[in-house]
Swiss-Prot record:
The keyword DNA damage does not apply. Pfam families: AIRS, AIRS_C. This is Phosphoribosylformylglycinamidine cyclo-ligase. GO terms for biological process: 'de novo' IMP biosynthetic process; adenine biosynthetic process. It is found in: Cytoplasm. PANTHER family: TRIFUNCTIONAL PURINE BIOSYNTHETIC PROTEIN ADENOSINE-3, TRIFUNCTIONAL PURINE BIOSYNTHETIC PROTEIN ADENOSINE-3-RELATED. GO terms for molecular function: ATP binding; phosphoribosylamine-glycine ligase activity; phosphoribosylformylglycinamidine cyclo-ligase activity. It comes from the Bacteria. Its EC number is 6.3.3.1. It catalyses: 2-formamido-N(1)-(5-O-phospho-beta-D-ribosyl)acetamidine + ATP = 5-amino-1-(5-phospho-beta-D-ribosyl)imidazole + ADP + phosphate + H(+).
Length: 345
C-alpha cells in the first residue's frame, strides 16, 4: 500500500493565509472611508447601508467599471499605488453626472497568485478614491485563481451605488438652444484609450520611464490617476441650475456628449478655448493619430462637460475654479436637426 501525499489548498495555488494577511493590512485604510450610514464592518456576508435621511424620494443609482488596459501599463511599470483611484473615479464620475452622491463602493480583485504588497497598494488606492469622493469602501472580493492569470498579473473591477433626490435627477432633458458648455480639465488620459497608448509606445520604441515630457517622465503623465470630480460637481448642482453633465470616457467627445443631448440639439465645441496637455500632443505625434481619432479615443484634456443656462455661467465658473477645478467655457448648444450631434470647430 503506497502512502498518498496529503494535499492542501495551498498546494493547489491558493494561499488563504496570504488572503487573511491582506485583510489585516487594509483594515485601517478602509475604516477611514466609513460613512455614518454604513452598519457593521468588514467581514460580513453582505454590507449594510442606510439611506441618508435628508432625501425625501431617494433614487439609487448604480455603476460598475474597470480601468481597461491602463492596468497592463501599471503592471509593466510596477506602479500599483494609483490604479485603485482610477477604478473608483471611473465609477463615481459616472454616478455624479446624474446628480447622484456616491454612498458605497465594492471592489473585485482577481489574480493568479496573490502578492499581498501589490494587492494592498491597489486597495489602498481604492480607499483613497473613496475618500476623495466621499463614499464608503464597504467590501470586496479577492480571488486567487491559479491557472487563470499569468504569473502575478491581476484584474480589478469596481461597483458603486449612489443616491439622488428623484426631483433632482440630471438626465439632459432640460438642455436647450443657447445653453453654455463648461469644461472641467482632466489629469491626463484618465482610464481610456490605453490600448492605443500601448500601441504607440510599442511602435515608437519609446521607454516611458526615461522619456521626459514637460519636465517629468512620460510614465508619470500616462499613469496620472483619473480626476475625481464628485465633490466639486455636487456643490455646483446644489447652487447652480445644471441641465446635463457628460463624463468623457471611452468614445471621447463624439460618443459621450450625445448621450446627454435631447433630440434636435447640437453641441458646438470651440477648439480654440483650450490647449491640449502635452501628453496628448505627444500621443498624436508619436502615433501619427488623426484629429478625429484623437477626439474619439481620448479626452484631450477635458474630463467632463457641463451644460447650463447662460445666466449661470459666471457663478458656475467661479465655484468650480474655487474648488480647485480647471474650468472654462468650451462651447454652446444650438438647435439643430443635423445627424452630427457634436461639432468641433
Amino acid at each position: 500500500m503506497t502512502d498518498k501525499t496529503s494535499l492542501s489548498y495551498k498546494d493547489a495555488g491558493v494561499d488563504i493565509d496570504a488572503g487573511n494577511a491582506l485583510v489585516g493590512r487594509i483594515k485601517g485604510v478602509v475604516k477611514k472611508t466609513r460613512r455614518p450610514e454604513v452598519m457593521g464592518g468588514l467581514g460580513g456576508f453582505g454590507a449594510l447601508c442606510a439611506l441618508p435621511q435628508k432625501y425625501r424620494e431617494p433614487v439609487l443609482v448604480s455603476g460598475t467599471d474597470g480601468v481597461g488596459t491602463k492596468l497592463r501599463l501599471a503592471m509593466d511599470l510596477k506602479r500599483h499605488d494609483t490604479i485603485g483611484i482610477d477604478l473608483v473615479a471611473m465609477c463615481v464620475n459616472d454616478l455624479v453626472v446624474q446628480g447622484a452622491e456616491p454612498l458605497f463602493f465594492l471592489d473585485y480583485y482577481a489574480t493568479g497568485k496573490l502578492d499581498v504588497d501589490t494587492a494592498s497598494a491597489v486597495i489602498s488606492g481604492i480607499a483613497e478614491g473613496c475618500l476623495q469622493s466621499g463614499c464608503s469602501l464597504v467590501g470586496g472580493e479577492t480571488a486567487e485563481m491559479p491557472g487563470m492569470y499569468h504569473g502575478e498579473d491581476y484584474d480589478v473591477a469596481g461597483f458603486c451605488v449612489g443616491v439622488v433626490e428623484k426631483s433632482e435627477i440630471i438626465d439632459g432633458s432640460k438642455v436647450s438652444d443657447g445653453d453654455v458648455l463648461i469644461a472641467l480639465g482632466s489629469s491626463g488620459p484618465h482610464s481610456n484609450g490605453y490600448s492605443l497608448v500601448r500601441k504607440i509606445l510599442e511602435v515608437s520604441g519609446c521607454d516611458p520611464q526615461t522619456t521626459e515630457l514637460d519636465g517629468k517622465p512620460l510614465a508619470d503623465h500616462l499613469l496620472a490617476p483619473t480626476r475625481i470630480y464628485v465633490k466639486s460637481v455636487l456643490e455646483l448642482i446644489e447652487k447652480v441650475d445644471v441641465n446635463a453633465i457628460a463624463h468623457l470616457t471611452g468614445g471621447g467627445f463624439w460618443e459621450n456628449i450625445p448621450r446627454v443631448l435631447p433630440d434636435n440639439t447640437q453641441a458646438v465645441i470651440d477648439e480654440s478655448s483650450w490647449q491640449w496637455p502635452e501628453v496628448f500632443n505627444w500621443l498624436q505625434t508619436a502615433g501619427n493619430v488623426e484629429r478625429h481619432e484623437m477626439y474619439r479615443t481620448f479626452n484631450c484634456g477635458v474630463g467632463m462637460i457641463i451644460a447650463l443656462p447662460a445666466p449661470e455661467v459666471d457663478k458656475a465658473l467661479a465655484l468650480l475654479n474655487a474648488n480647485g477645478e480647471n474650468a472654462w467655457k468650451i462651447g454652446i448648444i444650438k438647435a439643430s436637426d443635423s445627424e452630427q450631434r457634436v461639432v468641433i470647430e
